[in-house]
Amino acid sequence: MASTNDHPGESAAGDPVKLIAVRDSALSVDEVFRALGDDAAGGVALFVGTVRNHDGGADVDALGYSCHPSAEAEMRRVAEKVVAEYPVRALAAVHRVGDLTIGDLAVVVGVSCPHRAEAFDACRKLIDDLKHEVPIWKHQRFSDGTEEWVGAC
């Protein structure tokens, strides 16, 4: 992603979209929470998506995420849409790619807003739209030896 400062994935001063990244290393809830700090915000909402041990009645052993090169740009587009719809003071979203195991963090998103109801609503919109609009794919491997690709995480 093109950045206007020396820290890739981070925004320029004044931009409520503080952190957008796709990473092949472990994610940090603390990093996302720190990015959401704003003295005018009374509510901060976070969503942390983890790798679960089952899907559709089948036992999951592991999974991998892959993405299109445009994934970060699409994440930013989704983030800007949320910022336009809600009174967001700060927003951050980070998604993992590569091989993950049960319990690993797959995605961490969050928003800060003046009030809690707005923060909850904006965070839900952010994760739902990321899931449906950003070109990130999940490759699940099941304990019975089968596997499945799931489009747009």
How would you describe each model-predicted region?
Residues M1-A106, P114-R124, D128-C153:
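N-terminal, polar/charged subdomain of small-to-medium soluble alpha/beta proteins
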Residues V109:
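Phosphate/diphosphate ligand-binding glycine-rich loop within oxidoreductases
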